[in-house]
């Protein structure tokens, strides 16, 4: 067992989980649309691919720190299980329109934001103007 990596992941997960909880407190309504869960999942869908492509490459983060941020922070910050529970709650309440919007925005929006983040990170990583300045 890799104790050091496990502690790093757990430490970062602590902060990711707390931030998700606080956003949920502010945005989620007990019987309404799950804005908090949608928000954290879309933020995570953008930030994690960007982090993995750009920040790790540019800042030369260690594998251990990348693991702690990716698996720890963003793993705790984003939540597929809460997404699923929220979707089921909308179905049980027969809020069909809200269910369709929630699932659609979560899935399509998440993938599109991930693609955008990756594209943007590649562009920033391979910026020819910046490379000329640094040479």
Swiss-Prot record:
The chain crosses the membrane at residues 7-27, 32-52, 65-85, 96-116. One of its GO terms (biological process) is cellular detoxification of fluoride. It catalyses: fluoride(in) = fluoride(out). Pfam families: CRCB. Na(+) binds at residues 75, 78. GO terms for molecular function: fluoride channel activity; metal ion binding. GO terms for cellular component: plasma membrane. Na(+) is not transported, but it plays an essential structural role and its presence is essential for fluoride channel function. The keyword Ion transport applies. It is found in: Cell membrane. It is a multi-pass membrane protein. InterPro entries: FluC. Its main location: membrane. Keywords: Cell membrane, Ion channel, Ion transport, Membrane, Metal-binding, Sodium, Transmembrane, Transmembrane helix, Transport. Belongs to the fluoride channel Fluc/FEX (TC 1.A.43) family. Fluoride-specific ion channel. Important for reducing fluoride concentration in the cell, thus reducing its toxicity. This is Fluoride-specific ion channel FluC 1. It comes from Latilactobacillus sakei subsp. sakei (strain 23K) (Lactobacillus sakei subsp. sakei). The gene is fluC1.
């Amino acid at each position: 067992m890799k104790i050091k990596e496990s502690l790093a992941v757990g430490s970062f997960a602590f902060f990711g989980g707390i931030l998700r909880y606080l956003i949920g407190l502010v945005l989620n309504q007990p019987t309404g649309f799950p804005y908090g869960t949608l928000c954290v999942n879309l933020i995570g869908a953008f930030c994690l691919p960007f982090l993995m492509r750009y920040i790790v490459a540019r800042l030369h983060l260690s594998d251990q720190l990348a693991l702690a941020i990716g698996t720890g922070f963003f793993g705790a910050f984003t939540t597929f299980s809460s997404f699923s529970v929220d979707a089921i709650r909308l179905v049980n309440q027969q809020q069909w329109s809200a269910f369709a919007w929630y699932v659609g925005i979560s899935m399509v929006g998440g993938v599109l934001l991930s693609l955008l983040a990756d594209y943007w990170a590649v562009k920033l990583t391979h910026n020819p103007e910046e490379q000329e300045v640094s040479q």
